[in-house]
Amino acid sequence: MSDVQEATNQLLDVNLCENQMSIQVTESGPRSESEHLQVTIGATVPTGFEQTAADEVREKLGSSCKISKDRGKIYFDITVDSLAQVHCLRSVDNLFVVVQEFKDYQFKETKEEVLKDFEELAGKLPWSDPLKIWKINTCFKKKKTKRRKLNPNSSKQKIDNGRGDTTVEKDVKKELTNSVSDSQISDYYENPAIKEQVSTLIGDGLTSCKDETEENSKEEADPEVLKFRVTCNRAGEKHCFSSNEAARDFGGAVQDYFKWKADMTNFDVEVLLNIHDNEVVVGIALTEESLHRRNITHFGPTTLRSTLAYGMLRLCAPQPTDIIVDPMCGTGAIPIEGATEWSNCYHIAGDNNPLAVNRAANNISSLLTKIQVKEGKLPLGLPIDTIQWDICNLPLRTGSVDIIVTDMPFGKRMGSKKRNWNLYPACLREMSRVCRPGTGRAVLLTQDKKCFAKALSGMGHLWRKVHTVWVNIGGLHAAVYLLKRTPQSFVHPSEEDGERCPCTQR
């Protein structure tokens, strides 16, 4: 059997997830080699947090991890039974299985020759094992279309300022009930039968699915043809071709090889062609939408990605019983991510804007509803609270906070750069008051690096900069600063100064 025939046979049933729960576990016997199939997984991560993501992979999967020279990507090897755990990683945005990697691809001198090589490349690649992973991955990936149905109702709830939360909870429950991703990932760990089902699907060549397809083929003369698209991500200045040209010619060759149907929007398979200078990686996407789309259902004008929030929290290494505060929480992305991953700490989400506090509270409520649907019982709650306050006058005791993690106003969509010159020093001063001397730390994200550097220079006796991570947020070059609280005690400024906090100025 040729490689293309084998790959096609593994893809007979597109709707695997809809039929997974009806598959019966066969008699236990010798496990096939396919069950122990090892592949390389690629993941996109927030730029600057590649090392953080690599550390999480080593910690949770026990796999060695390689950081790509192409910023924002990591690679690691797994076996099939670890696939569900990969989808539970908190620091990765998108996942793909590597078909083949060319570390030093030799591009020809002319565009015509390069594109001709791309056409010939499609028939030379080892597609079989990656397509097996793609097939079983459909049981774990989140469905993009079902999330879109929820968004219009969520927007209406924002206008109502939190009224009608029952409708939102019903929509969340409906979404979670119809989706297999979260519940089946949980069942994968707790129920050995699910693991056996996965093994059966791979080891026995998707026997049950093929049987069902054969029954359907009696009604339909031809099996459904898979739809696909090719996406080319290219970085480098020495290429004589464009991304569209590479995707077009390589995609045409893939279509001729598999006899699939090209569809740029409603596709089943997304083939990736990643090019960075002389490094070429061909892969198959394992996520329909970024994994950072979790936790948040009520969005604000500046909602931080959950993957970036996780990276910021991990930078400060939370310990059990730590009190972690986000004094400018917005939608609550950071404290919600913290309460989910570090449940042995206590998290406080605060903001001076009542709408932001309301959004954070609604996001916490939605997360509790999600947990209730997943576990089938009322959750005990999360170690998190919300409060409205003034960042320059926090209602917290001096030296009572272990960690401060926050996304500071950039002065773009929120606030202004002019106000930041007064706001940043006042924020750092108040943060130094509530943070524990000697052991306290702060992780602060800002794009207004010049203003922050000036404010920090005047706080050298209270804060010491330990590390800086350069990140890209929506095209803006920002920085995440890890600060350590010095042992020096905080001294209140004299009342004679009469300094007004910029947070309260109108």
UniProtKB/Swiss-Prot annotation:
Residues 170-286 form the THUMP domain. Its EC number is 2.1.1.256, 2.1.1.-. Residues 144-172 are annotated as: Disordered. It is found in: Cytoplasm. CDD domains: THUMP_AdoMetMT. One of its GO terms (biological process) is tRNA methylation. Keywords: Cytoplasm, Methyltransferase, RNA-binding, S-adenosyl-L-methionine, Transferase, tRNA processing, tRNA-binding. It catalyses: guanosine(6) in tRNA + S-adenosyl-L-methionine = N(2)-methylguanosine(6) in tRNA + S-adenosyl-L-homocysteine + H(+); guanosine(7) in tRNA + S-adenosyl-L-methionine = N(2)-methylguanosine(7) in tRNA + S-adenosyl-L-homocysteine + H(+). The keyword Metal-binding does not apply. SUPFAM superfamilies: S-adenosyl-L-methionine-dependent methyltransferases, THUMP domain-like. Pfam families: THUMP, UPF0020. GO terms for molecular function: tRNA (guanine) methyltransferase activity; tRNA binding. Residues 157-172 have a biased composition (Basic and acidic residues). One of its GO terms (cellular component) is cytoplasm. PROSITE patterns: THUMP (PS51165), UPF0020 (PS01261). The keyword Transferase applies. Belongs to the methyltransferase superfamily. Catalytic subunit of the THUMPD3-TRM112 methyltransferase complex, that specifically mediates the S-adenosyl-L-methionine-dependent N(2)-methylation of guanosine nucleotide at position 6 (m2G6) in tRNAs. This is one of the major tRNA (guanine-N(2))-methyltransferases. Also catalyzes the S-adenosyl-L-methionine-dependent N(2)-methylation of guanosine nucleotide at position 7 of tRNA(Trp). Part of the heterodimeric THUMPD3-TRM112 methyltransferase complex; this complex forms an active tRNA methyltransferase, where TRMT112 acts as an activator of the catalytic subunit THUMPD3. This is tRNA (guanine(6)-N(2))-methyltransferase THUMP3. It comes from Bos taurus.
